[in-house]
């Protein structure tokens, strides 16, 4: 029977099991005040290298909490992956953390209209994966993200999820990110 580890021992154990390799950097996209970056740093035992957010207040707070990161205060679609990697001093991304806006998927939004551009933010993961080497991607979102599908425009011009096509876009996104393998494929 194994022994139980306390939180600090688990974190140290995870950091030893998963660390950055030579030349790898860590990315926190959609970085807010730095909570995800703090967790990443606890596991890896080193600072996050690249942080991106379009909101100046969020980036200023992140800078205070994580001064060693290269900060980008701009639309994530406008950040050039190759340039960000070059400026960070790395040659690949060992860990990329993605937290695209969840409000346009969450059931907490109720029946209110949704924004296509915000719902499409997760596609930026594919852009980065096609442009720079990434060893491990983490994408955090609400469980309703799995229902991501096409939108229909109603009579008022508002966009709402097509109830007959739930999950279609999520499946396409997963295929694009995994070169078509099922997320449950053991290979």
Model segments located where?
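Conserved active-site and SAM-binding loop architecture
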Residues: 1-187
């Amino acid at each position: 029977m194994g022994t139980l580890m306390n939180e600090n021992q688990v974190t140290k154990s995870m950091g030893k099991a998963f660390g950055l390799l030579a030349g790898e950097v860590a990315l926190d996209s959609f970085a807010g005040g730095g909570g995800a970056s703090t967790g990443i740093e606890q596991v890896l035992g080193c600072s996050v290298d690249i942080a991106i957010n379009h909101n100046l207040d969020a980036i200023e707070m992140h800078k205070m909490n994580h001064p060693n990161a290269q900060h980008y205060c701009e639309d994530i679609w406008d950040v050039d992956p190759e340039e960000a990697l070059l400026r960070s001093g790395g040659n690949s991304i060992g860990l990329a953390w993605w937290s695209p806006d969840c409000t346009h998927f969450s059931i907490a939004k109720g029946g209110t209209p949704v924004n296509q551009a915000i719902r499409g933010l997760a596609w930026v993961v594919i852009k980065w994966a096609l442009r720079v080497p990434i060893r491990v991607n983490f994408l955090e979102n609400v469980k309703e993200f799995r229902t991501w599908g096409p939108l229909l425009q109603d009579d008022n011009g508002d966009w709402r999820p097509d109830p007959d096509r739930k999950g279609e876009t999520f499946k396409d996104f997963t295929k694009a990110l995994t070169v078509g393998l099922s997320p449950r494929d053991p290979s």
